[in-house]
């Protein structure tokens, strides 16, 4: 009877150890994500810490609040994003994730805010390059901001060139007609 209880106790302890190990194990990330940087820091309550992102392409910012609560604000318009001025944000208690699209202008401003509910917050942010290829359900006809911007620049330049050519043509034609009218009259 004692041997049976001993086996049950050993199985129970082993299960507890496995659960404990799994909770401390690194979080799984997709194979397509390549780790570029790991940034650790501390931030006081109500303060900001600013970082700059220069890497091109799709970037994933994964921040874990180790102590306290740090929030994440991202912008391609300003290098000092805040809770008043940002394009992307993640303000959860614990893990914050922001996906920075490839079309964002570089450098991208990253603001880390220490929530006032804690005197000091500690964070660890992992910066990943996302190599996933997006499959658009409508193929080439789908919206691609980078391609649209390039096409708009091309169409504006061809319109400007044709307007310039027309303008020069009409200027020369009017000049010749004025010359003919002066000679005749």
Curated annotation (Swiss-Prot):
Pfam families: UPF0669. Belongs to the UPF0669 family. This is UPF0669 protein C6orf120 homolog. Residues 1-23 form the signal peptide. The keyword Secreted applies. It is found in: Secreted. It comes from Gallus gallus (Chicken). Disulfide bonds: none annotated. Glycans are attached at residue 47. Keywords: Glycoprotein, Secreted, Signal. One of its GO terms (cellular component) is extracellular region. It comes from the Eukaryota.
């Amino acid at each position: 009877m004692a041997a049976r209880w001993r086996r049950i106790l050993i199985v129970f302890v082993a299960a507890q150890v496995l659960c404990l190990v799994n909770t401390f194990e690194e979080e799984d990330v997709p194979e397509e994500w390549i780790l570029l940087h790991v940034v650790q820091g501390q931030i006081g309550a109500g303060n900001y810490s600013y970082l700059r992102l220069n890497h091109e392409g799709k970037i994933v910012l994964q921040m874990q609040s180790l102590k306290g609560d740090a929030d994440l604000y991202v912008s391609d318009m300003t290098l000092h994003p805040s809770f008043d001025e940002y394009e992307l944000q993640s303000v959860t208690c614990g893990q914050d994730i922001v996906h920075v699209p490839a079309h964002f202008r570089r450098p991208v401003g990253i603001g880390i805010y220490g929530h006032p509910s804690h005197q000091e917050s500690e964070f660890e942010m992992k910066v990943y390059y996302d190599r996933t290829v997006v499959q658009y359900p409508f193929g080439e006809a789908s919206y691609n901001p980078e391609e649209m911007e390039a096409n708009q620049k091309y169409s504006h330049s061809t319109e400007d060139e044709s307007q310039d050519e027309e303008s020069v043509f009409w200027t020369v034609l009017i000049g010749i007609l004025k010359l003919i009218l002066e000679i005749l009259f």
